[in-house]
Amino acid sequence: VYKRQAKERMVALVKNLQESLGERVKGLAWMGDSTKVKALEKLATFHVKIGYPDKWKDYSTLEIKDDSYWANMERTNEWNHAEMVAKAGKPVDKEEWLMTPQTVNAYYNPTTNEICFPAGILQYPFFDMNADDAFNYGAIGVVIGHEMTHGFDDQGRQYDKDGNLKDWWTDEDSKRFDERAQVMVNVFDSIEVAPGVHGNCRMTLGENI
């Protein structure tokens, strides 16, 4: 059962891990000062979503009938499509969630620079209100750190703090990042996942980072 106190505790966990990641960024010997400033700005402006949205999506115009599952799916898909098309030309709603609260997952969205942790994942074994911080840092803390890092992986680093597709790295720092990423690519590509079949780290680099 999701409790309000879970959000309060998650807010504290996220804040502490933001600060910790910030210290790691400051200590990077290979990253220049100008890129560090931009990275820290992006980290500090993460839009954090926890539990469930403050504004629920209005489904009042969606018709669910007892005719057939297929027909209900058709109507639902049509409704979703119409809702998406209606957003064209309008300001981006940064309060909109891309996952339902009951989803056991989390995400980082580079176009809004947000990290989201639905109520569904705030339960054992990822999170336990009755456990001490050590347990939760070792469980949900891994998920929090994972999503934060997506903001600076091979894909996320291409977006700025406002979610714009904009290069905020110096050429030298970008080159150094690619050199370090290539080391990881080489390691994962050398893994034989099945007889005669090797991994393709370029396809999974963001997750591997």
Briefly describe each language-model feature range.
Residues 1:
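Active-site loops and adjacent core secondary-structure elements that bind or stabilize anionic groups
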